[in-house]
């Protein structure tokens, strides 16, 4: 279908088929710019010295818009499209050594980017799985050094002792003496002597209790 003229001196209105064809041609050409060897090919044949071709490269900048860029399979082409806007780059890309250097750097970038992206994705998945709310992991995740640098809470003997006393209430006389054995207290730690007179947990002796300082208690 032929293009229709809107009026005298006006640009023709493209038909739907013509717009589709132009879209496909631009999409293919823009993505070819991701290949440094293709840029070297164009430079050797003098395309980058043609003012019309340079204007066309400026026109192609509309592919950087999100609505157009979403169709690109090789987004690296937009980086080279920006470089082609500079005369210095258009002049240097004709050099084979420059082209080889850019090609090698692009390959290294893709290799390291893939590895780095895989590693970051793996760490991100672990962080989301072990995301803590109120100090507790959600979804069965395990918190590790990568997820939290906060020190682990230390055990509080005073709280444990108070909790034990609260769960097992006793009369004041019973707390101080149980089964005829005195209560020994040092540094806030209570140690109850057993029937044999030894300190509960360590230092048991027959016939008398031993406090935490090693002195014998009758």
Curated annotation (Swiss-Prot):
Family annotation (Pfam families): Med31 (PF05669)
Region entry Disordered, spans: 142-218
One of the record's GO cellular component terms: mediator complex
Keyword annotations: Activator, Nucleus, Transcription, Transcription regulation
The keyword Disulfide bond belongs to this UniProt entry's keyword annotation: no
Principal subcellular localisation of the protein: nucleus
GO molecular function: transcription coregulator activity
InterPro entries per the UniProt record, alphabetical: Med31_sf, Mediator_Med31
A GO biological-process term: regulation of DNA-templated transcription
Biased composition (Low complexity): 155-187
Transcription keyword on record: yes
Biased composition (Gly residues): 195-211
Compartment(s): Nucleus
Subunit field text: Component of the Mediator complex.
Family as reported in the entry's similarity comment: Belongs to the Mediator complex subunit 31 family.
Stated role: Component of the Mediator complex, a coactivator involved in the regulated transcription of nearly all RNA polymerase II-dependent genes. Mediator functions as a bridge to convey information from gene-specific regulatory proteins to the basal RNA polymerase II transcription machinery. Mediator is recruited to promoters by direct interactions with regulatory proteins and serves as a scaffold for the assembly of a functional preinitiation complex with RNA polymerase II and the general transcription factors.
Protein name from the UniProt record: Mediator of RNA polymerase II transcription subunit 31
Organism the protein comes from: Aedes aegypti (Yellowfever mosquito)
Lineage, opening ranks: Eukaryota, Metazoa, Ecdysozoa, Arthropoda, Hexapoda
């Amino acid at each position: 279908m032929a293009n229709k003229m809107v009026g005298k001196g006006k640009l023709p209105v493209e038909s739907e088929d013509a717009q589709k064809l132009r879209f496909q041609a631009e999409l293919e050409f823009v993505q070819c710019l991701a290949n440094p060897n293709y840029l070297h090919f164009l430079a050797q044949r003098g395309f980058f010295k043609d003012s019309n071709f340079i204007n066309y490269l400026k026109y192609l900048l509309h592919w950087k818009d999100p609505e157009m860029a979403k169709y690109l399979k090789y987004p690296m082409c937009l980086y080279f499209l920006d470089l082609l806007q500079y005369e210095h780059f258009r002049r240097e890309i004709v050099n084979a050594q420059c082209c080889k250097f850019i090609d090698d750097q692009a390959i290294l970038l893709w290799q390291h980017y893939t590895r780095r992206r895989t590693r970051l994705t793996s760490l991100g998945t672990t962080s989301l799985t072990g995301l803590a709310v109120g100090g507790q992991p959600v979804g069965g995740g395990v918190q590790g050094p990568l997820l939290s640098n906060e020190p682990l809470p230390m055990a509080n003997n005073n709280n444990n002792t108070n909790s034990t006393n609260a769960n097992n209430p006793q009369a004041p006389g019973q707390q101080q003496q149980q089964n005829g054995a005195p209560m020994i207290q040092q540094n806030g730690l209570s140690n109850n002597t057993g029937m044999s007179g030894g300190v509960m947990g360590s230092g048991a002796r027959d016939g008398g209790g031993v406090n935490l300082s090693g002195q014998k208690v009758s």
